[in-house]
Each structure stands twice: as C-alpha cells, then as structure tokens.
Amino acid sequence: MLFSWYKRFFSQPHQPFFTSGILFFTLFMILFILVYSNILVLDTSILTYHAYSMVFVVFLQFFLGFLFVVFPKFLMQAEISEKIYKRHFFAYFFNSLCIFLSLIFYSKITFVFQIFLLITQIFSFKLLLDIHKKSLVQIKNDTKWVLIAFFAGLISHFLFIISNLDFKYSFFISKIAINSGFYLFLFMIFLTISQRMIPFFTRAKVPNHVAYKSLKFLKIVFILLILKIVILSFDDVRFNLISDIPIFFIITKELIKWKLPIFKVEAIIWILYLGLYWIVLGFFISIIESFFAIYNSSIYFEKIVIHSFALGYFLTLLIGFGTRVILGHSGNQIVANRFTVIIFIALQFIVLLRLFSSICSNFGLDYIFFLNLTAILLVLVLLVWSSKYITILLKGK
C-alpha cells in the first residue's frame, strides 16, 4: 500500500515539489517567529534564515513544480521523465532540510548545503535549457525569459554563497545577491509566467478575450530591474525614483492593454488578477517611500516594498496557480469554492497587515508584535489551505 501511494505521489512533478515548497515555507516562517519572539537565538543574520531561504529554497521549489509541468508543453516536447524529476526533488528536499537544521544546530556548515543546492539548481537550469534548445517551436520568447531569469538566479545564489566568506565587502555582496535574486530571478519568473498563463486562463473562461501584449515588455522591465539593483546598492531609497517611476508606468500601461475582464471571471481567475495589481501597488508604494525620504525622512517604511511583492504578488499567485494546478491535475473541477475564496481574502488581509507592520512604529505601536502576528496568521492560513489542497497532492493521482 505504501508503494502504491509512493507511485501516485510521484506520478506528476508538481505533487512532490508543491508539497515540499509549502512544507519549507511553513518551517522557515516558524523559525522566523521563534527568533523574533526571543524563543530561539540564531548566530546568522536575517538575510540567511529569512531572505535567502525564501528566495533560493522555498519559492524555487514552487517554480520547479510548475515549470517541470508546463515547460515541455510550452515547447511541444515530451514530458520530463519521473526518474529525472524525482532525482531533482530529492536533491532539493535533502539540501533544504539540511539548511534548515544547520541554521538551528550548527550554522557553520550551512554554506556546504547552500553549495549543494546551487549545484542542484544548475542541473535544473540545464534540464530546462536542453528542452528549450531541442524544441522546434518558432516563438520561444517566454521560455527564453524564464531561462534568463533562472540564470540570473544562479549568479545571485553564487554571490550569496561567496558572501559567506568573511571579508570587507561580504555584507554588501550579500545584499546585492538577495536583491538580484528577488527582482531578476523571482520577480522576472513570476512576471514571465503571469503574462503567459493569466491571459491563457482568462480565455478559457472568456473565449473572446484578447490580451494585447507588448513584444518588448519583458526586455524593458528586465533592463529597468537591473537599473533598480544598481540603485539599491547605494542604500538610499530616494534614488529608487529613477527606476521605479518608469517601471510603474510601463507595467500599469501593459496591464491596461490586457483589458482583463474582472467581473466576467470566477474567483479562481480573479485572484490571479489581484496578484497582478500588487505589482502596480508595490512600485507605487516604493515611489511614495522615496518621496517621503526626500521630504520627511523621519517616516520609516520597514521592508514595505519587498513584502508588497513577496506576499501581495508572489504568494497570491502561488496560492492562485497552485490551487488551479492541483485541482486540474487531480481530475477535480477547477472552481474556487467558498472555502477557497475565504482563503484568498484572508491572504489579502495578511498582506495588508504586513504592510501596516512596516509602518506601525511611526504611530508608536509595537512593531515586533504586529510582525509576529502577521507571521503566525500567515502560517495558519497556509496550514488551512494545505488541509485541503496539500491533502490532494499527498493522495496523488
């Protein structure tokens, strides 16, 4: 019976990768809560146990679960064999678990498993690159940009590992690595998948809908994000206006051109639209933060922009895409019932609460309290969502 379950669980790549992603998302968030509640003391910085873990451990596994399914379909190639994606999964799972445990018990060896994780990531990149090269599909723009973003992630990951060495510019390099990993890797992959899949999902519900997408949209955004990474290295939010204003207007203009039929689609689709709008809100918030830095520098915006994207955009889309993929590939009807809609709404409340946490100290409120409250609620929502959807994954098909 166990063998039968094992075969079902690994019958599709998204099942083990999504399960692992949600597991480590929960574990690293619990670790974060324990540290900020003074229950646990770690001898590493938040860049490692929170930023690094989210960028290169958690979100990466969600991506691969999705990419290992859709990449061959995009390029009209044979599905990735179970033997290959199982090999990748076990490498990611083992190294992720070792990173998590080493951070708690012996952080001096964490970098060893980071190196192994990077090597695994390189093999995943090569796998996707080979599929891209073999394809005879003429238009491969979307998969090309996924690979470009993935390669940027490899460089960012390598830089972060190098920053573990104790030298004069190690902290500076670690920040460059996290910023480039966040924007050039995560943000670009999310954006590339979003502009490919969301109009596609929309047409499934509204057949006459046409999204007028700009051919050079991804290229322009990528160049501006490189500019943003350079500007962030100066550690002065006033300069962010140089990159954020053009990105804000370009993405806003693009989304307007898509003419998304908000009131003609079901919850399983409009939650994806909501995730897209967080891109615009995130850059708008960044612009507001920069103006405050110029005219009233006493106002503090603690990581508000990063979490606008990480929770508002990334996590909303992960839950939205994840729900749809899990239902569709398990033979269930692709519909968000009342339970799922409540999860969607609760997640948006948590995003707003995290943004409020970023500015609450300006009103004399307890920042740590609201930060921990947000993290605890987020873990609870993930567990509630998992009680239905990860259960489906664990059953397998």
Model-predicted segments: where are they?
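Hydrophobic alpha-helical transmembrane segments of multi-pass integral membrane proteins
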Residues: 1-397
